[in-house]
């Protein structure tokens, strides 16, 4: 059978590295046929982390990081294809998200910025590359995010149940797939970002593996209440957020004196905050039908988070996308392969019910090989 392969490439707010996956669109539904990961080089991660945390840089530095990211994507793709015995001619197109460095969808001059020079990606791989997916949605009045729910709808929706796909990356976002209703999707809260930043500050680790550190801590109710008292949670959907809100500076403002607490107690509280802020939103969506929560992203491998979701959502079946045929670490990368497929065929790939756009459009800028 003839294959119709597209390569999705994603690097998220966690800055851990580059996810890559190949989707075969000759299959119905499309099938994930290969996936891989390239760690972010430490020097590039440090520069990106500083840029994300401060929002400040020089044009010279920004241009250099843009170039370095483009090279990282290109080299990651070439190595990935070689490892899976694929050639450039096997791939119809690449869908590459780029690296978000700022997302500001509100105000008089809404904008979003993803960097990583896609001219380098197309030139170095010899594969047509699709990128810059978010700005056209914003140009027609949308938030530019989230883009993945349209893909979730095609893969996971069922007329028999309410399905919510929860992606726990740096930020937590959901796709709400309700029978006979338009799909909606939006950012609901922080994901791993605060927990990752906190353990990096105190233990120089990138993340709290298996919640081992958080499990040694004790919940701080007063801090939890303060964190949950955040105006973002009261905003109507669709809405989007990022590290420009949920960061260590925000955390410090939410507590009179963070240093008065044991760091592990703060970590346990941040884990609980991540769960409860999401659960509060999910409970507003509960229906009489069966309710299924499908978790994906790095946070779906956190046993403490998954345990607390199960405990706080007794009416829901709580599972991961692994159990439904899509590796939890590669759902977003798979979505960008789908977005590229739609763009190449000039099909719409945004959902106005999700982003708030005035009309459906075909997102993505084409960089020919």
UniProtKB/Swiss-Prot annotation:
Documented EC number(s): 2.7.1.170
Q: Is Acetylation tagged as a keyword? A: no
Listed binding positions for ATP are 12-19
Which GO annotations describe the biological process of this protein?
1,6-anhydro-N-acetyl-beta-muramic acid catabolic process; amino sugar metabolic process; peptidoglycan turnover
Give an example GO molecular function. Answer: ATP binding
Pathway per its UniProt entry is: Amino-sugar metabolism; 1,6-anhydro-N-acetylmuramate degradation; Cell wall biogenesis; peptidoglycan recycling
Q: Which domain of life is it from?
A: Bacteria
What catalytic activity does the UniProt entry give for this protein? 1,6-anhydro-N-acetyl-beta-muramate + ATP + H2O = N-acetyl-D-muramate 6-phosphate + ADP + H(+)
Checking InterPro entries in the record gives: Anhydro_N_Ac-Mur_kinase, ATPase_NBD
Q: Name one Pfam family in it.
A: AnmK
- Which keywords does this Swiss-Prot/TrEMBL entry list? ATP-binding, Carbohydrate metabolism, Kinase, Nucleotide-binding, Transferase
* CDD domains to which the protein is assigned, alphabetical: ASKHA_NBD_ANMK (cd24050)
Q: Establish whether keyword Cell membrane is in the entry.
A: no
Q: What does this protein do?
A: Catalyzes the specific phosphorylation of 1,6-anhydro-N-acetylmuramic acid (anhMurNAc) with the simultaneous cleavage of the 1,6-anhydro ring, generating MurNAc-6-P. Is required for the utilization of anhMurNAc either imported from the medium or derived from its own cell wall murein, and thus plays a role in cell wall recycling.
Query: What family, per the record?
Result: Belongs to the anhydro-N-acetylmuramic acid kinase family.
Put simply, this protein is called: Anhydro-N-acetylmuramic acid kinase
Query: What is the species listed in this Swiss-Prot or TrEMBL entry?
Result: Actinobacillus pleuropneumoniae serotype 5b (strain L20)
């Amino acid at each position: 059978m003839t294959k119709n392969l597209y390569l999705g490439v994603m690097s998220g707010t966690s800055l851990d590295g580059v996810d890559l996956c190949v989707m075969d669109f000759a299959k119905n539904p499309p099938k994930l046929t290969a996936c891989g990961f390239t760690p972010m080089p430490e020097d590039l991660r440090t520069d990106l982390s500083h840029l994300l945390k401060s929002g400040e840089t020089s044009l010279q530095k920004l241009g250099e990081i843009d170039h370095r990211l483009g090279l990282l994507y290109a080299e990651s793709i070439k190595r990935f294809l070689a490892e899976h015995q694929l050639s450039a001619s096997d791939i119809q197109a690449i869908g590459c998200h780029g690296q978000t460095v700022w997302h500001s969808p509100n105000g008089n001059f809404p904008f979003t910025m993803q960097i990583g020079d896609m001219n380098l990606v197309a030139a170095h791989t010899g594969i047509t590359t699709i990128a810059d997916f978010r700005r056209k949605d914003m140009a027609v009045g949308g938030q530019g995010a989230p883009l993945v729910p349209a893909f979730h709808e095609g893969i996971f929706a069922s007329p028999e149940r309410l399905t919510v796909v929860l992606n726990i990356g740096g930020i937590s976002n959901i796709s709400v797939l309700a029978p006979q209703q338009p799909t909606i999707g939006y950012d609901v809260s922080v994901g791993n970002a605060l927990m990752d930043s906190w353990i990096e500050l105190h233990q120089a680790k990138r993340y709290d593996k298996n919640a081992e550190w958080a499990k040694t801590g004790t919940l701080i109710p007063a801090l939890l209440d303060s964190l949950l008292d955040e105006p973002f949670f009261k905003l109507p959907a669709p809405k989007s957020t990022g590290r420009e809100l949920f960061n260590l500076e925000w955390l410090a403002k939410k507590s009179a004196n963070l240093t008065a607490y044991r760091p592990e107690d703060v970590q346990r509280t941040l884990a609980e905050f991540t769960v409860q802020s999401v659960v509060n939103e999910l409970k507003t969506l509960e229906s009489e039908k069966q309710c299924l929560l499908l978790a994906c992203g790095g946070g779906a491998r956190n046993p403490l988070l998954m345990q607390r979701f199960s405990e706080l959502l007794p009416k829901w079946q709580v599972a991961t996308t692994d159990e439904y045929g899509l590796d939890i670490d590669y759902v977003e990368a798979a979505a960008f392969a789908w977005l590229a497929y739609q763009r190449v065929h000039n099909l719409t790939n945004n959902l106005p019910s999700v982003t708030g756009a005035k009309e459906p459009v075909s997102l993505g800028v084409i960089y020919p090989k």
